[in-house]
A protein has these predicted regions:
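Alpha/beta enzyme core
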Residues: 1-210, 214-234, 241, 247-251, ...
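Flexible C-terminal active-site loop/helix
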Residues: 256-302
């Protein structure tokens, strides 16, 4: 899914059309975010309302539309205890994901940057990731290919039990030792912590999550690679752009415009192509019944 050649840009996606557009533009991987699914599928904030069924239903469509592009699924806090974590890993693999991200928030979880976010104890965090790795190994034993992305939100936690860089580093080291394929922590405070993280973690791959949030500097993939990262996640960029675009079109319609200005719209032919009509027509033509009207199977001797 990831290579060691530079830093892979991993956009966040929340529906099948977004996955299709990313794949058409030759992105190498994507991340289906719980934040995006909760917003687009439920119309709700990311406060634990998108359950396992909602996520795997959305994920099945996203992974199908993504084609050969690997997609990491946001497994949140595993939707319960360790048995739920195991079930989540197996369900995400069955849905077509290449990997699942499991974090150490309490359940039900919420957006890492929201008020009142808390993490579980060290012991519970370790048990959760151990259960995820065990389920991954079960998949691999059956010939499947799957990865575990282990995340800690301890750097941003508000409960006093994990709101520090050193606590986040302890958890990342533990997740690494348990066999997670990728580890990362939310909310690094500047490049000094980013560089220190990569100096202390030895997993094959590390990831940085970036959010377009006031007061936070966004780094380019090249800058991330120079700090030691293998992937940079932009989980909310496409959702944020979509909300802005839809709101602009809505405002234009509210002003009495029956037709929204072209500057806000995708040209019809381009929309037609992006959704895949031409591919569908080519498939219908390739297997047109008219081509088989005179078909007869060859005689078979006994």
């Amino acid at each position: 899914m990831l290579s060691k050649d530079g830093c892979e840009l991993m956009p966040g996606v929340y529906d099948a059309l977004g996955a299709r557009l990313l794949a058409a533009n030759d992105f190498q991987c994507a991340f289906m975010s719980g934040y995006g699914v909760a917003a687009s599928r439920l119309g709700d904030p990311d406060v634990g309302l998108a359950d396992l069924t909602a996520m795997t239903d959305a994920g099945t469509a996203v992974c199908r539309a993504a084609g050969a592009m690997p997609v990491v699924g946001d497994g949140d806090a595993g939707f319960g205890g360790v048995a739920n974590v195991r079930r989540t890993v197996l369900a995400y693999h069955a849905a077509g994901f290449a990997a699942v991200s499991i974090e150490d928030q309490i359940f039900p979880k919420r957006c890492a940057f929201s008020d009142g976010m808390q993490v579980v104890s060290r012991a519970e965090a370790v048990a959760r990731v151990a259960a995820a790795v065990d389920a991954r190994d079960e998949i691999r034993a059956r010939g499947g290919d799957f990865m575990i992305v282990a995340r800690t939100d301890a750097r941003l936690a508000s409960d006093g039990g994990g709101g520090a860089f050193e606590e986040a580093m302890w958890r990342c080291a533990a997740f690494e030792d348990l066999g997670a394929d990728v580890v990362y922590f939310e909310g690094p405070d500047g490049e000094r912590e980013m560089e220190a993280f990569n100096a202390r973690v030895a997993t094959p791959f590390t990831m940085l999550a970036q959010v377009e949030k006031p007061g936070r500097k966004l780094l380019t993939p090249t800058e991330c690679a120079n700090l030691g990262y293998d992937a940079v996640l932009h989980g909310l960029t496409l959702l944020s752009a979509s909300v802005r675009g839809v709101n602009a079109a809505i405002e234009a319609m509210k002003e009495g415009n029956r037709a929204v200005g072209d500057e806000l719209l995708t040209p019809f032919d381009a929309l037609y192509e992006a959704i895949g009509f031409e591919e569908h027509y080519a498939l219908e033509e390739k297997f047109s019944p008219a081509k088989y009207a005179a078909y007869e199977p060859p005689p078979r001797g006994r």
